[in-house]
């Protein structure tokens, strides 16, 4: 009955090699070791990114909810990739116009979508250099250009 791991005095190499091979099954290790966060994610490993608004879109919520979530299509300045970003709060889509410069941040769980919004991994934080929350609370006004 041979089961389990080797336990002898001279088993260190076997244990080390085994552990090294098994680590590749761990998704977090694999992503870190291969550097895929920098290669594949639109933000390139950073927490925020600036972009230009291309259009406003409504994304339908997943079942069992029924709503149209207000989002914008944004082209990132740093690499030209196009992403969809959620615009939080009631009526905040009115502050965002096409060709505005927006600051995006992550939204949801470790690069996955949040809640009932399919495929939307980012949210709008600032519009034309002014915080979206400040605009919404009417503490600041959007600069007229």
UniProtKB/Swiss-Prot annotation:
A GO CC annotation given for this chain: cytosolic small ribosomal subunit
Disordered: annotated span: 1-23
Primary location: cytoplasm
Gene3D superfamilies: Nucleic acid-binding proteins
Residues bearing PTM Hydroxyproline: 64
Domain of life (superkingdom): Eukaryota
Cross-referenced InterPro entries: NA-bd_OB-fold (IPR012340), Ribosomal_uS12 (IPR006032), Ribosomal_uS12_euk/arc (IPR005680)
GO biological process, one term: translation
Keywords of the record: Cytoplasm, Hydroxylation, Ribonucleoprotein, Ribosomal protein
Subcellular compartments: Cytoplasm
GO MF, one annotated term: structural constituent of ribosome
CDD domains cross-referenced by the UniProt entry: Ribosomal_S23
Description of how the protein assembles with itself and partners: Component of the small ribosomal subunit (SSU). Mature N.crassa ribosomes consist of a small (40S) and a large (60S) subunit. The 40S small subunit contains 1 molecule of ribosomal RNA (18S rRNA) and at least 32 different proteins. The large 60S subunit contains 3 rRNA molecules (26S, 5.8S and 5S rRNA) and at least 42 different proteins.
Family note: Belongs to the universal ribosomal protein uS12 family.
Record's function text: Component of the ribosome, a large ribonucleoprotein complex responsible for the synthesis of proteins in the cell. The small ribosomal subunit (SSU) binds messenger RNAs (mRNAs) and translates the encoded message by selecting cognate aminoacyl-transfer RNA (tRNA) molecules. The large subunit (LSU) contains the ribosomal catalytic site termed the peptidyl transferase center (PTC), which catalyzes the formation of peptide bonds, thereby polymerizing the amino acids delivered by tRNAs into a polypeptide chain.
Annotated protein name in UniProt: Small ribosomal subunit protein uS12
Organism field: Neurospora crassa (strain ATCC 24698 / 74-OR23-1A / CBS 708.71 / DSM 1257 / FGSC 987)
């Amino acid at each position: 009955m041979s089961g389990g791991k080797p336990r002898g005095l001279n088993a260190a190499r076997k244990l080390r090699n085994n552990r090294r091979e098994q680590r590749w099954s761990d998704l977090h290790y694999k992503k870190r070791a291969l550097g895929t966060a920098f290669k594949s994610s639109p933000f390139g490993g950073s927490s925020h990114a600036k972009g230009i608004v291309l259009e406003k879109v409504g994304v339908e919520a997943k079942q069992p909810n029924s709503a149209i979530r207000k989002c914008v299509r944004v082209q990132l300045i740093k690499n030209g990739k196009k992403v969809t970003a959620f615009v939080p709060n009631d009526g905040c889509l009115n502050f965002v116009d096409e060709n505005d410069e927006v600051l995006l941040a992550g939204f949801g769980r470790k690069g996955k979508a949040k809640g009932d919004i399919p495929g939307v991994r980012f949210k709008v934080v600032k519009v034309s250099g002014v915080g979206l929350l400040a605009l919404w609370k009417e503490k600041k006004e959007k600069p007229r250009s």
